[in-house]
Amino acid sequence: MSRIGKKPVSLPQGVTATVNGQTVTAKGPKGELKFVVNDEVLVKMEGSEIAVQPRDQTKTARSKWGMSRTQIVNILHGVKDGFEKKLEITGVGYRAAMQGKNLQLALGFSHDVVYETPAGVTIAVPKPTEITVTGIDKQQVGQVAAEIREYRGPEPYKGKGVRYAGEKIVRKEGKKK
């Protein structure tokens, strides 16, 4: 039984939502997002709240119940406040810079890595060692941050590479003589 799925989702101030069949559409100050709920989950609007229920008591329907509610909460939060992921670059000569709409990364390769910014996401470089990814879609912001981190993930010996802000890297001890 989903404990999170039982709670109805209340609409934040300044956000309007509509439920049309299995599609939930949210409009807010930052933009508009749509989410198609799985067929095994029933979604309905009750006043200024969105209620999510499983269609039957099968294991798959109950497992998708809480996840559907959480994704609805995420689109409501996204159109109101948006989401942000911060990345840090550590290492000698490792740096980032914006080149038009593209992110240019110097990560110790023989060439610079150029990352094209997808639509719906904004990338900013406040310092050469910091990258900020912002957008209204939580999944897309996280995906872009993960793709940037994947170019040169933090290594365990010196901790060089691209990491999430606040991420702890488990360090290893080097070889001993």
UniProtKB/Swiss-Prot annotation:
One of its GO terms (cellular component) is cytosolic large ribosomal subunit. It comes from Mesorhizobium japonicum (strain LMG 29417 / CECT 9101 / MAFF 303099). Keywords: Ribonucleoprotein, Ribosomal protein, RNA-binding, rRNA-binding. One of its GO terms (molecular function) is structural constituent of ribosome. Transmembrane segments: none annotated. InterPro entries: Ribosomal_uL6-like, Ribosomal_uL6-like_a/b-dom_sf, Ribosomal_uL6_a/b-dom, Ribosomal_uL6_bac-type, Ribosomal_uL6_CS. This is Large ribosomal subunit protein uL6. The gene is rplF. The keyword Ribonucleoprotein applies. PANTHER family: 60S/50S RIBOSOMAL PROTEIN L6/L9, LARGE RIBOSOMAL SUBUNIT PROTEIN UL6M. HAMAP family: Ribosomal_uL6_B. Pfam families: Ribosomal_L6. Part of the 50S ribosomal subunit. The keyword RNA-binding applies. Signal peptide: none annotated. PROSITE patterns: RIBOSOMAL_L6_1.
